[in-house]
Each structure stands twice: as C-alpha cells, then as structure tokens.
Amino acid sequence: MKKLGTEKIPPLVGRGVLLDMTKHFNVEYMQLGQPITTDDIKLAAKSQNIKFQKGDVILFYTGWTDKMLKSDPDLWNSGEPGITNDAAKYLSSLNPMAVGADTWGVEVVPAIEGDKLFYGHITLLKENGILILETMNTGELVRENVDEFMFVLGQPKIKGTVQMIINPVALW
C-alpha cells in the first residue's frame, strides 16, 4: 500500500458517542445476523438523548463480543449483529470521523436480504472517508452508563498497513 496506508491517518481526537443497542432491543446481547437499521439508530439515539454532531466517533454496543468471544468463539467468528447497508448510508450522512462497534466487522453478517455483504465498508470508508473501528471494547462504557466521552486514538504509523490493532482511550 503506497497511497492509503494507515501512516497517512492523523491521530483521532474528538467526541465519542455510544449507542447501547442491547438497551434499545432490551436484550443481554444481540444475536448473530440481527440487523441494526437506520430506524434503530435514530430511536436508540433519541432514547439516550444523543444528538449527533459532525466529526463524532459513533460506536455501537451489541454485547456480541462480551457474550460470545470466550463462550463460543466459533459462533462469534461465524457472523455477527451489525449495521445494514442503509444504516451505513445514514451514518455517512451524519459526517462522523469514524464508526465502530464491539463486533469484528461492524456490519450484520450474514447480510440481510437485499443487502451486499460488507458494502457498508465501501459506503463509509471508500465513498466518504469515514474510518471503521472494529472489535471495540465498549462494554465498560455501557457498564458505567457512559453515552458521551472524549475519544483519543494515536495509532501506530506503520508504512503500508491498511489495518492494525489499536488501543483507543475514552475519557469521561
């Protein structure tokens, strides 16, 4: 990668918001293949009194990784709850700096009928330059009832890489 490696990405510092989708769906954790739609995002934000702002880091808590990574890693790896293609378009319209989740791909897997698998990556990253943050440890924020925080990430500057393990910080 010579043009778009992660060494070109500046440190990310901004307002983070966390949508607790387990609270929205009234479940301990979302299920494999369970979609997060545009309406779900709007309703969860409204119930948490979150008003999106340009440049936000928008994160989702599904409970999927907290519940399934250790108890059933094969199931955890076979699919996940996540955003739909339409939800990715809606999120892009909010002009966030980044979108992420506590899942390994952010998007629903398998894709819902009519959606293309991982097309949200194209919508967010390729078409809109919105960074994607996967397998984010958002559980502690939920347990502390934190919806809004300062998000700080100084990622490694490794030339030619397109992804990496990161350790962002949420300050509240």
For each feature predicted by the language model, list its residue ranges.
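Active-/binding-site microenvironments in catalytic and ligand-binding cores
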Residues: M1-W172
